[in-house]
Amino acid sequence: MVKRLQGVLPIVHTPFTDGGEIDVVTLKHEIDWAYAQGADGLGTGMVSELLRLTYSERIALTHHIAEMSAGRGAVFAGVGAESTKQALIYAQAAEKAGCDAVMAVPPLTTGLPDDQLVDYFRALADGISLPVIVQDASGYVGKAIPLRVYVQLLERYGEEKIVFKPEASPIGPNLSALRDATGGRARIFEGSGGILLVDSYRRGIAGTMPGMELLDGIVALWRALQRGNDEAIYRVYYPICAIVALQLQAGLDGFLAIEKDLLVKRGIFPSDRRRKPYAWDLDAETAAEVDRLFARLQEALK
C-alpha cells in the first residue's frame, strides 16, 4: 500500500566515490541515519544533484532509495525533466521501483505558458497511479508556477493525487494564497531548509522537505511546532536559520557545499565530493562560521 506523504521528508544527498560514481554504501548509511533521526520518509530532489546525474544514475538512485528505505517511511523520487517524455520515463521507473510518490519541477530552460504547464503535469498524473508533488523551485532555478495552474490541477485530480511544494518568493504569502484559493484542500509542503519552516507551519503545511545535514534539528523543530512549545521552537530555530542564511548566499551550490561539508563532519559521508561543474566552493571563513553555528544547534538539541 502506498504511504501518505506527511511530516519531515528529507531530500537525499548523493554521495560519490573517488571515481565519481554513486557511493551505494554511504547512501545506505545516510538513509539509515535519516530514519534513526525520526524522518517520516525521504526522497530525491534538486539537492540530490539530479540534474548532474546521468539517465542510468537517476534510475538507479530511485531504485536504491526505495529498496534501502525498506518500508520505514514514504519514499518519493524527483522526476522533473526538460521534456514530458523524459519526466514520464522517470516517473514510471519510480512507480516500478516501489516509490510512494513522485516530485516534478517543470522544464527549467524555458518559461512555459499555463496550458503547457498543465499538460506537463497532467501527463505525469495520468501516466502513473502515484501522487504527484508539483514543485516550484523558482526560488533558485526556473520560473514560478502561477496559482491558477495549481488550482486547475487540484480541481481535476483532488488533494490525494496532486500535492504541492511551492518555493516561489515570497514563500509564506504564496503558501497562504494557495491554501485560501483551494479552501484549505491543498496539501502543501515547504522546502526552505528550515529558515521558513516556523512561518510555513503556522500557515498550515502538511510537511517539510529539508536537506539531510540539519535533520536532527528539523525533526526537533517540527515536533516542537506540533506541541506548540515556543521556547523549544525558537531555541532550535535560530541556529538553523543562521546556517541556512549562509547557504542562501550562493544558491543551489551554496546549499550543496555546506550540506555535504556538514555530512562529512557528522561522519555520514567520507567526502564532500560534488558533481562538476559548480559555481561555488566553501571558503575557510564561511566554514568556520558554519562550525560555530552547528555547535550552537547541537547544544540547543541537548
What spans do the regions from the language model cover?
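Secondary-structure boundary/capping signal
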Residues: G73-A74, V132, K161-I162, A186, ...
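Active-site beta->alpha loop and helix N-cap motifs at the rims of alpha/beta catalytic domains
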Residues: V2-A144
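General structural feature for long, well-ordered alpha-helical segments within catalytic domains
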Residues: R4, D23-T26, E30, E57, ...
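Catalytic alpha/beta core domains of metabolic enzymes, predominantly
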Residues: G127, S138-L252
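C-terminal alpha-helical cap/extension of soluble enzyme domains
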Residues: L9-H13, Q37-G38, I205, E213-K302
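Basic/polar N-terminal segments that are highly enriched at the extreme N-terminus
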Residues: M1-K3, L301-K302
